[in-house]
Amino acid sequence: MIVLGALLVLGVLQGLVWAAVAPGVPYKVLADGRFGALPTTSTYHFVAAAIFALSGMVIGVVVAAAAWQIRSARGWQMLVTVVGGSLVGATVGWLLGEVLAGGVDPASVGVTAADSIVTAPATTGTWLVVLAQPALAAAVYTFLAAWNGHPTLDRPDLYEVS
């Protein structure tokens, strides 16, 4: 439960940080209310997605390594907890970040006296960025288990008493 709670808190923090640092998308709004994306719009989507995915990957590595340090809970149950919690935490962060990202919807500007440039809220463009965190968490935890070399994963409760 501690691991799940930590992953939820980290997901909320990830969403807050992402909403603050991810770049919004610039649009040109014409005086008659029509709008269009600027030529560099795809770059902004890529940067926003990369920031979210990389922050999730860092969280995934740190949480997997920290969970491995809990010797009494090593095993497939902790792997499922870390991966499932990472998926839930990343989803919470993604949804929260998308809601909190500041900006102006270009469709809401309407008719104005002159053309203008507005910045729409940041968006990752896809929900697939959520998968980076649990995927790397699973890879790191599995690597640590494979590298361990002990049949009992060095769990103190599984040592045989002779």
State each model region's role.
Residues M57-A67, G85-V88, V92:
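Alpha-helical transmembrane segments within multi-pass membrane transporters and channels
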Residues E98-V118:
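Interfacial non-cytosolic loop connecting adjacent transmembrane helices
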Residues P26-H45, V111-A114:
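Perimembrane loop-to-helix junctions flanking transmembrane segments
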Residues Y44-V58, S116-A139:
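Hydrophobic alpha-helical transmembrane segments
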Residues V3-A19, V80-E98:
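Hydrophobic alpha-helical membrane-insertion segments
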Residues M1-L8, A50, A73-S86, G125-A132:
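N-terminal export and membrane-targeting signals
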Residues M1, P23, V61-V82, E98-D105, ...:
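Cytoplasmic membrane-interface segments at the C-terminal ends of transmembrane helices
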Residues G15-A31, V99-G103:
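Membrane-helix exit/juxtamembrane interface segments
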